[in-house]
A protein has these predicted regions:
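Bacterial lipoprotein signal-peptidase II cleavage site
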Residues: 25-37
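Extracytoplasmic "Venus flytrap"
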Residues: 45-97, 101, 110-123, 127, ...
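Beta-alpha junction/loop-to-helix N-cap segments that form part of ligand/metal-binding clefts
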Residues: 115-180, 286-293
Length: 393
């Protein structure tokens, strides 16, 4: 039975503040895994047909090199990056990367800050238009909340690309509005657009949970449903859990971004008390892990009996993983790489050519696999060098 601890609110507009607290934020072939982290019960043999073997954990990941096709950087362009909230690491990291990439391409670049207040977003889009922007990159700002200004931008021929942002035509908004984004990051043939990409990301998180619990996952699932991208990652996760005959989501805990901290920790504590049968926890994003879920897991005294799938895997969450403090694994889709991919997409739009494969995917990280000794995750691919060479800069 699903336990809901708060009520879902509308997706459009209201989710921007919480969206700024996260990235998403995805399925490749199986690979033989190293031993599971030592604070997780050993994986039991899987029943025939059950996706529960340790070899089903995709430690190889799905990151690959971006397309190397030559695509010269456009000349004399001005780009405005609109951040959902620079006070949040989930916004500041990809935005800084996009700014770095745009400047490497030789473009004049400005960053506007919505400051975690959705009411500021329409005015900032109009400010970018008035400033003579050739392109606008929206970070965690969905189309419905800025529909009017985007229509104005489109009328002026301004190119628009999103970073973890969803167009007005996205099915999740349940309308028939035409798209207002000029293009989107190319996530590859298997997940060409962000909805499919993020569903697959969530599915791989679930596969790791299923394998770590021997095909008998009993999951407390946390989500912030006003955030569009989390509905996609959540769907991918839950759909994969449903394929497992002996797995179940025993509690679904919904929360708003404003509840991060003591309120979320209390919800997590209550869910853990109400579900002693739970052996797994799913966090939707890093801030939720840090500001509620991981502390509740540690204080429950059950950390050694729970497999906790964390969020995006920013450096503070990796520190918890290294210390065994309420996080067992994270699935990382590198946000700095995403910022560069957004600029590459913008460059293709300026040239009137299709967006090239970004190479973006994700990397599962746990205590024994793919974890650096300290600091943030560093992908093996030097994506910056590849993009610069392709742009001729």
């Amino acid at each position: 039975m699903t336990l809901r601890l708060s009520r879902t609110t509308t997706l459009a507009g209201a989710g921007l503040t919480a969206a700024a607290l996260l990235l998403t934020a995805c399925g490749g072939g199986s690979t033989t895994a190293d031993p599971a982290p030592d604070n997780v019960a050993p994986v039991a043999p899987a029943a025939s047909g059950a996706p529960a073997a340790a070899s089903d954990i995709n430690y190889e990941g799905t990151l690959r090199e971006p397309a190397t096709t030559a695509r010269a950087a456009a000349k004399d362009k001005k780009v405005v990056i609109i951040s959902a909230g620079q006070a949040s690491i989930s916004s500041s990291v990809p935005v800084a990367a996009a700014k770095e990439a745009a400047e490497a391409a030789g473009w004049q670049t400005d960053v506007y800050d919505v400051q975690l207040n959705p009411a500021n977003a329409p005015g900032l889009v109009r400010q970018a238009i008035a400033a003579g922007a050739d392109g606008i990159i929206l970070q965690a700002v969905d189309c419905p909340g800025v529909k009017g200004p985007l229509q104005e931008a489109k009328a002026k021929g301004i190119e628009v690309v999103g970073i973890y942002s969803f167009d007005c035509s996205d099915p999740i908004f349940e309308g028939n509005d035409p798209p207002l984004f000029s293009g989107q990051i190319n996530y590859g043939a298997d997940a060409a657009e962000i909805g499919k990409f993020t569903e697959k990301y969530g599915a791989d998180q679930a596969k790791a949970v299923i394998a770590a619990t021997g095909g008998k996952a009993k999951v407390i699932f946390f989500n912030s449903p006003t955030v569009t991208v989390l509905n996609y990652t959540g769907k991918g996760f839950k759909d994969e859990i449903e394929k497992c005959a002996e797995c179940e989501i025993v509690a679904e805990v919904e929360f708003a971004g404003s509840e991060l901290g003591p309120n979320l920790q209390q919800k997590a504590t209550s869910a853990l008390l109400q579900h002693p049968e739970a052996n797994a926890v799913k966090s939707p994003y890093t801030s939720a892990t840090l500001l509620g879920i991981a502390p509740a897991v540690v204080q429950s005294g059950r950390a050694s009996k729970l497999y906790v799938m964390g969020g995006e895997g920013f450096a503070p969450e990796l520190d918890l993983l290294r210390a065994g403090q309420g996080v067992n694994a994270v699935n990382i889709a590198p946000s700095d790489w995403t910022g560069w991919a957004a600029v590459d997409t913008m460059n293709s739009l300026f040239a009137g050519t299709p967006a090239q494969d970004s190479g973006l995917g994700w990397q599962l990280v746990d205590k024994d696999n793919n974890l650096t000794s300290n600091g943030p995750f560093v992908p093996k691919t030097d994506f910056k060098a590849i993009y610069k060479k392709a742009w001729g800069v």
